[in-house]
Curated annotation (Swiss-Prot):
Recorded family membership: Belongs to the G-protein coupled receptor 1 family.
Organism of derivation: Rattus norvegicus (Rat)
Lineage of producing organism: Eukaryota, Metazoa, Chordata, Craniata, Vertebrata
Protein name: Trace amine-associated receptor 7h
Tree of life domain: Eukaryota
Xref: Pfam families: 7tm_1
Length: 358
C-alpha cells in the first residue's frame, strides 16, 4: 500500500494534467451539452468596453427615438403628415433598439446565443422587418420632401394625412410579411443544407442566406436607394433655383404673399436637407454590410466573424443616428426635449406650446 508521501506527487501531476487539458480544450456555450457551440470569449477588459459601446447604442436608439415619437405625437404643432412618417420611422428604429440590439449585444460579446432557437428566428425576423421598414419610410419621406420643395403651397393638398397613413401602412405591412416569411418558410436556407448542418449547434443563432435571398435583399435596398438619390438630386436643383430667385426678389419690393411663399420654401428646404442627411447616413451604414453579404454568398462565406460583427453593428447604430441628426438641425426638437426632460410636458395645455422660434 502506497504511503501519503508516495501518492502526493502522482496526485499533483494529475491535477496539473487536468488543468492543462482544461486550458487547451475549447470553451463551450453549454459545458454539459455535447452539441454545444464553441465560444471564443473576450478577455475582461475588451468585454467591458464592448458591452459599454453596444449597450450605449441600444439605450440611445430607444431613448432618442422615444423622444422623437413623444414630441411629434404630443405637441399639436408637429401634427403633420410628414411628421407622422418621421414618427413611424422612429418607431421602427426604437423597436430595433428594444428587440434586436440587446440580444445581439450578448451574442457579439459572449460568442453564444442564450435565448433559444425560437427567439433566434423571431430576432432575425424582427431585424429584417424593422430595418426594411426604416428604408421604405425614408424612401417615402424623400418623395414627401420633393413635393414640399417643388411646390410648397400646393403640398398640403397633395400629401394629406390619408396619403401619409397609406405610406406608413405599406411600409410596415410589406416589411413584416417579407421578413417573417423569409425566415419562417426556410426560403433563406434553401440549397444550403450542408452549411445549415454545420452551423447547427446549441448556443448558436446563425441563419445563412442563399444567393437568391441575398440578391433579393440587395434589390430591395437598391431600388429605394435609386429613388431617393434621384429625388434628392431634383430637390437640390430646385433648392438651388429657389435660392437664386429669392436673391433676385430680395432686391425688389415683394407682396406679402410672395414673402410668405419664400418663408415656406425656406422651411421646406431646411427640412429636406436634414432628412437628406438622415438618408445619407442610412445608406452609408447599410452599403458595406450588403456588399459583404453578396461577397459571402458567392464566395463561400469568407468574411471573418469580427469583420461581420463590425458591419452589423454599424447598421444597428444607424437606428440611433436619426434623433441625433434631428437634435442638431431642428430647433423644435431641442425645445421639445427640454419640455419632456424637465417634466413640463405634464402641465395642462402643454400640447399647444409653440416650439418654433420663427
Amino acid at each position: 500500500m502506497a504511503t501519503d508521501d508516495e501518492s502526493f506527487p502522482w496526485d499533483q501531476d494529475s491535477i496539473l494534467s487536468r488543468d492543462l487539458l482544461s486550458a487547451l480544450s475549447p470553451q463551450l456555450c453549454y459545458e454539459n451539452l455535447n452539441r454545444s457551440c464553441v465560444r471564443s470569449p473576450y478577455s475582461p477588459g475588451p468585454r467591458l468596453i464592448l458591452y459599454a459601446v453596444f449597450g450605449f447604442g441600444a439605450v440611445l436608439a430607444v431613448c432618442g427615438n422615444l423622444l422623437v415619437m413623444t414630441s411629434i405625437l404630443h405637441f399639436r404643432q408637429l401634427h403633420s403628415p410628414a411628421n407622422f412618417l418621421v414618427a413611424s420611422l422612429a418607431c421602427a428604429d426604437l423597436l430595433v433598439g428594444l428587440t434586436v440590439m440587446p440580444f445581439s449585444m450578448v451574442r457579439s460579446v459572449e460568442g453564444c446565443w442564450y435565448f433559444g432557437d425560437s427567439y433566434c428566428k423571431l430576432h432575425t425576423s424582427f431585424d429584417m422587418s424593422f430595418c426594411c421598414s426604416s428604408l421604405l419610410h425614408l424612401c417615402f419621406i424623400s418623395v414627401d420632401r420633393y413635393i414640399a420643395v417643388s411646390d410648397p403651397l400646393i403640398y398640403p393638398i397633395r400629401f394629406t394625412a390619408s396619403v401619409s397613413g397609406k405610406c406608413i401602412t405599406f411600409s410596415w405591412f410589406l416589411s413584416i410579411i417579407y421578413g417573417f416569411s423569409l425566415i419562417y418558410t426556410g426560403a433563406s436556407e434553401a440549397g444550403l443544407k450542408d452549411l445549415v448542418s454545420a452551423l447547427s449547434c446549441v448556443g448558436g443563432c446563425q441563419i445563412p442566406m442563399n444567393q437568391s435571398c441575398v440578391l433579393i435583399n440587395f434589390l430591395l435596398f437598391l431600388v429605394p436607394t435609386l429613388v431617393m438619390m434621384t429625388v434628392y438630386s431634383k430637390i437640390f436643383l430646385i433648392a438651388k433655383q429657389q435660392a437664386q430667385n429669392m436673391e433676385k426678389m430680395s432686391k425688389q419690393t415683394t407682396r406679402a404673399s410672395d414673402s410668405y411663399k419664400d418663408r415656406v420654401a425656406k422651411r421646406e428646404r431646411k427640412a429636406a436637407k436634414t432628412l437628406g442627411i438622415a438618408v445619407a447616413a442610412f445608406l452609408l451604414s447599410w452599403l458595406p454590410y450588403l456588399i459583404d453579404s453578396i461577397i459571402d454568398a458567392f464566395l463561400g462565406f469568407i468574411t471573418p466573424s469580427y469583420v461581420y460583427e463590425i458591419l452589423v453593428w454599424i447598421v444597428y447604430y444607424n437606428s440611433a443616428m436619426n434623433p441625433l441628426i434631428y437634435a442638431f438641425f431642428y430647433p423644435w426638437f431641442r425645445n421639445a426635449i427640454k419640455l419632456i426632460v424637465t417634466g413640463k410636458i405634464l402641465k395642462q395645455n402643454s400640447s399647444t406650446t409653440n416650439l418654433f422660434s420663427e
